[in-house]
């Protein structure tokens, strides 16, 4: 592998200083337990242990839903694991804070380093194995490929990844927004250098959801740290997405039946049959636009669905949408707006994935009572009130959000949290590569919003062709948040970014499969190209499809 000579002075200086330090010299190469000697006032090391090859426990299902990195029990290679905390301190609320991390370094190291992104509001340190952050992926985790992998809680310790109570602390907000990326990377590189006796030759960042946001942050705010960045379903404009989630809850509650206490039952605003009706309506209108009616809308740009076609006629009560439900859908898909009708968040694309369990889990939930369990409702209430709003509003109820004021209330955190920058000249100049993927049926972060950002990124970077030299976007038809839905959600973005960075092979398309369509393979085309059936050949095989520009 090539050695990159364009490293910034910060990283180079840290590596030299560490390798020359008495503690590092005392530890010696491949002395895992000896890494504990690197602890100091600003670095706690709770564990430094050499582990034999074994089995990795399965990811917590709730956590996996936030990161996409679902996995069954997998074989784990022999490796050194280090766990600790950076910059421990006492916060303004008398809580203990610090940036927790876990680093795993395999015995058969390939010279690569991966920063594994988190999900939700973070607050927990996930197993640093580098699982591919898309639910259907069958590709091996990065650790099994020989990567050294680090993970973090982003600077606070929560009861789970929906806990936003850290938002009352200024430094905790900053750490979660972006600063933990730099601190954890610095520490991980120091530990790798001490253990291996040399720094990594290539450095990568990969995550989905909030981990996708921090992946973009890695490229935008730390442009000299990473060679390649993979951002999946990124919550890049998360402050506005949280507002949109409040908007959606209010819109859907207006169509929902009430419980005995008069509370709206969010999960019943739209039944599974309602969503299946919409999905079938979208497929009927748009499925064949890519040359083949097969349950997947690859010609996403050409799909113009009007839900009014599903309106109940006089005396009709089945296989149609009542006016209140139709209005709720129009409000949600039209995007959040303020009191003057100005857009607060993007529109959403109509796609077949609306009927999938993942869409319902985020937008509606399954609770039969007036206490909702939709992930958007539970996460947004906490994050909007405690993290995004200044001053914080504990106990915020989404039904009380004032859309004429909420943009101003969230502006301060948006300025440090949202990964909306389009000037990435330093990242590009040192050869950085960016690969982004996103589900067209994501119910959390709108695919329309990401497409708008991508167009702006192209406009500010010399146009579409120049942008494609260092950044590629791959839209996944039917896919929900970080996987799931009627989609081909089994692909390997880590292999693609690695080949691009190290061998110069830019990905024109990502080969994809998925459990929703057994035996099928398709290309996920680099945006704005879309997959089309050639008109002949096996309709289940990737070779029968080509990437074409969208129809004018």
Whereabouts are the PLM-identified features?
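Bacterial N-terminal signal peptides that target proteins for export
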Residues: 2-12
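Catalytic-loop region of hydrolases
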Residues: 26-112, 125-128, 136-137, 279, ...
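A catalytic-pocket lid/entrance helix-loop region that shapes and gates access to the active site
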Residues: 217-219, 224-337, 475
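Gly/Ala-rich beta-loop-alpha elbow adjacent to hydrolase catalytic centers
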Residues: 207-211, 215
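Short beta-strand/loop motif that positions the catalytic acidic residue
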Residues: 436-438
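Cap/lid segment of the alpha/beta-hydrolase catalytic domain
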Residues: 110, 118-197, 243-244, 251-252, ...
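Conserved alpha/beta-hydrolase "acid-adjacent" motif
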Residues: 444-448
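N-terminal signal peptide c-region/cleavage motif recognized by signal peptidases
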Residues: 20-24
